[in-house]
Design a protein with these regions (language model features):
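Surface-exposed amphipathic alpha-helical segments
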Residues: 197-237
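Short secondary-structure junctions
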Residues: 36-52, 125-139
Length: 237
């Protein structure tokens, strides 16, 4: 269950109520100016129980951003209205708090497994097909923390009528020109004794080519999208 929070800049002095108790909202810090310059807009902020451990709930305080400029460009040209790229940053909190002497590293394996499963499920809920988990690697954040980075592969096929993809029609296999390979990334790390999750997804092919339109706003490809997303992930704290 999600507990919506009014969109606001990097503030941590808000609260939400759950089961009669008032809890602080501890949103992660994100590079606001970089996001604004890149055409990203804040889609929502939520605080929700992401999953439960035997003795506690794990609450996720999340900021979700979408590439509004890319979405508008596609909508203007072909009438398909959906987010094509997204980026999120999450700070996890435990309710009740971890007991004295037990740090986040002691539950890292469990949290990591659940986070990876949840991210794959989220990609599927967004209409992406054939979601699969790929390789794992390491990366350094801008604060010097070491993060685990996992790649996800998926696909999306725009419906010519403007609806969601189904991936079940004839001619919609991975070799079909209108099928868009999608890449997702999920990073997990510990910063200042608290878990951070960050990630997102983007099309692997230029949307101008896939949608057969001439528009420089749709010309960017995977290298540009990949580097921008990974830079945003590194900047989360």
């Amino acid at each position: 269950m999600a507990y919506p929070v009014a969109p606001q800049a990097n503030s941590t002095d808000r609260t939400y109520k759950h089961e009669g108790y008032v809890h602080p909202v501890m949103m992660p810090s994100v590079p606001e100016e970089r996001l604004a310059a890149g055409g990203w807009t804040l889609a929502e902020e939520t605080s929700e129980t992401r999953f439960e451990l035997p003795t506690m709930r794990v609450v996720a305080h999340t900021r979700l951003y979408e590439d509004a400029e890319l979405r508008e460009a596609v909508r203007d040209r072909v009438g398909i209205d959906r987010p094509w790229r997204f980026f999120f940053a999450t700070r996890l909190a435990f309710r009740p708090s971890l007991a004295p002497g037990i740090g986040p590293a002691m539950v890292y394996s469990t949290v990591s497994s659940e986070a990876k499963r949840e991210f794959a499920a989220d990609l599927a809920e967004r209409g992406f097909k054939d979601v699969s988990r790929g390789r794992n690697q390491r990366m350094r954040t801008e604060t010097g923390d070491r993060a685990s980075l996992t790649k996800y592969d998926a696909s999306y096929r725009p419906d010519p009528a403007g609806g969601d993809s189904t991936g079940e029609r004839s001619g919609t296999g991975s070799g079909d020109r209108r099928t868009i390979p999608v890449t997702g990334w999920l990073a997990i790390w510990i910063h200042e004794n608290a878990f951070r999750l960050a990630g997102g997804a983007y099309p692997e092919r230029s949307l101008a080519g896939v949608l057969d339109v001439a528009d420089e706003r749709l010309d960017s490809g995977r290298e540009t999208y990949r580097e921008e997303l990974l830079d945003l992930i590194r900047a989360v704290r």
